[in-house]
């Protein structure tokens, strides 16, 4: 039986500190709902991508994403830039 609980993962990318985006939060069920609520409170763009969140959820907290995930995460960062008109690490 497939687990139908909501899942969420959050990334942070600080170019001056990180060589790649990092997982800063992940969870299922109530924890996922809290992650999404906090993101909404802070006007952080949300993207619904169940396959990507599944892969990100397998990573350890604060782990940088592996190189084979760069393309998928670059698409997320491009989405965030389009929504916020702000490039990560810029003022």
PLM feature segments, named:
Residues 1-91:
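Divalent-cation
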């Amino acid at each position: 039986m497939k687990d139908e609980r909501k899942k969420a993962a959050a990334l942070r990318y600080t170019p001056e500190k990180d060589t790649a985006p990092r997982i800063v939060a992940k969870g299922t069920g109530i924890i996922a709902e809290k992650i999404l609520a906090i993101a909404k409170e802070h006007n952080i763009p949300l993207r619904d991508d169940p396959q990507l969140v599944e892969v990100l959820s397998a990573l350890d907290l604060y782990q940088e994403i592996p190189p084979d995930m760069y393309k998928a995460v670059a698409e997320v960062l491009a989405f965030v830039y389009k929504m916020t008109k702000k490039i990560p690490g810029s003022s």
